[in-house]
Amino acid sequence: MTDKPKQYVKEMFFRPQHLHFTGIGGIGMSGIAEVLLNLGYQISGSDVKLSPITERLAAMGARVFEGHAASNIAGARALVVSSAVDEQNPEVQEARRISIPVIPRGELLAELMRLKYGIAVAGSHGKTTTTSMAATILNYAGLDPTVVVGGRVGTMGGSNARVGHSDFLVVESDESDGSFLKLAPIIAVVTNVDREHLDHYPDLDAIRAAFLEFVNKVPFYGAVIVCLDDANVQGLLPEIRRRTITYGTTAQADMEAGDISCGPFASEFRLRYRTADLGRFRLHIPGRHNVLNAMAAIAVAMELEVKPDTIREALETFSGVDRRFQLRGQERGIAVVDDYGHHPTEIRATLDGARQCGFRRIHVLFQPHRYTRTFHLMDEFARSFHQADSLFVMDIYAASEKPIPGVTAESLVERIRQFGHRGVEYVGTLDRGVDALVAAASEGDLVLTLGAGSVYQAGEKVLERLRTEGKG
């Protein structure tokens, strides 16, 4: 018998209409916009600056405006906003004036999931890579999921979204503003829990409570997949009320990785799942943290009855995610890599992975991201760079935040020195950072740009300088 009420709701939701996205160039907003474009919606949007992301959406049929203005939302049935958009935005004010709904991004994502079998990946770090791996495996296995992820994925044609024709939806959730609590997945993944987004959460206990609420929203027939290597995740286990699958590098985990080896831009490991030896798996990305990310994705796939050999083949096709230890190029024997890492835990994991690749020396250009994060995690940042032979620090990328007195790149550099790093230097600007990297690097070295702001622009500049100056 047809489920007529559910079918009616689907038809009502997927009836094409005009939605406007304020901040459409954001990685999270653009993914949902792309999915809705492919479902036949009329999409418009605006952002402060146009970008390759907005150009892609425009080529797909979206109408994109540079800058925010009340006139941009003419004809829209609803306004979609990210947590970065406040009530003073002229488009929000116009939406209030003409009485059309203002929908948070997380709420719209939850509506998409309500009509699908949702797999949601959460965690303080590793979400994008884990989500991308899970999506790659499920698509390779023929499950044809719809996907929304916070990074551009090679196996998805360089996009951060895809529309599948099955009832599966794979999403990267967003704990930064608590919006992941709107989701109701049948499978929930937690990669780790850390002190992050302290502009939203008062303390670590509040963060832990939010993740616990998230996993306990899974229905009784669903599953929770968590990393047993993470101490804060271990602390959640006694209070998780749903069927739980653990993964990690300990024999206590349901899924255990062993015999881990990492080389230049690759990792291998042997996998045990309960009593079964699943054999060796190979990744084209380095680092123990990426082995853990892969294990979470493998656990999702096995929960959906994908065969181990299919999973192994799918992971061989996965080349990584944009800005996640991404090789930008090599010149004169010097590798230039870019990474989005902007939290101390991410930085340590990235540098540990880089060190395992066998480079002679590692030179880092780091751009701190947000004054609040730098303030709350100053000492953690100061402990995070000891695997870097030289470290050059740019000014803080504000990300719309107002400065905090005494919280500067210079104060961070001084704190890093106090914690024992002898090769740290304040450079301030991108161009001075490029100068410092070119002067420091020699054959066999790694140049690594780190941060969530504009620091990625340094990579191509370094490569061009190495080409033209014959540095080596």
From Swiss-Prot:
Q: What does the record give under GO molecular function?
A: ATP binding; UDP-N-acetylmuramate-L-alanine ligase activity
EC number annotated for this UniProt entry:
6.3.2.8
The pathway noted for it is: Cell wall biogenesis; peptidoglycan biosynthesis
Which Pfam families has this protein been placed in?
Mur_ligase, Mur_ligase_C, Mur_ligase_M
Keywords on this record? Answer: ATP-binding, Cell cycle, Cell division, Cell shape, Cell wall biogenesis/degradation, Cytoplasm, Ligase, Nucleotide-binding, Peptidoglycan synthesis
Q: Which reaction does it catalyse?
A: UDP-N-acetyl-alpha-D-muramate + L-alanine + ATP = UDP-N-acetyl-alpha-D-muramoyl-L-alanine + ADP + phosphate + H(+)
The residues listed in the UniProt record as binding ATP, with positions renumbered to this chain, are: 123-129
Q: Where found in the cell?
A: Cytoplasm
A single Gene Ontology biological process assigned to it is:
cell division
GO cellular-component term (any) = cytoplasm
Main location (coarse class): cytoplasm
What the entry lists under InterPro entries is as follows:
Mur-like_cat_sf (IPR036565), Mur_ligase_C (IPR004101), Mur_ligase_C_dom_sf (IPR036615), Mur_ligase_cen (IPR013221), Mur_ligase_N (IPR000713), MurCDEF_pg_biosynth (IPR050061), UDP-N-AcMur_Ala_ligase_MurC (IPR005758)
- Classification via NCBIfam families: murC
Report the family membership: Belongs to the MurCDEF family.
- Role, per record: Cell wall formation.
The entry's protein name is: UDP-N-acetylmuramate--L-alanine ligase
- Supply the source organism for this entry: Solibacter usitatus (strain Ellin6076)
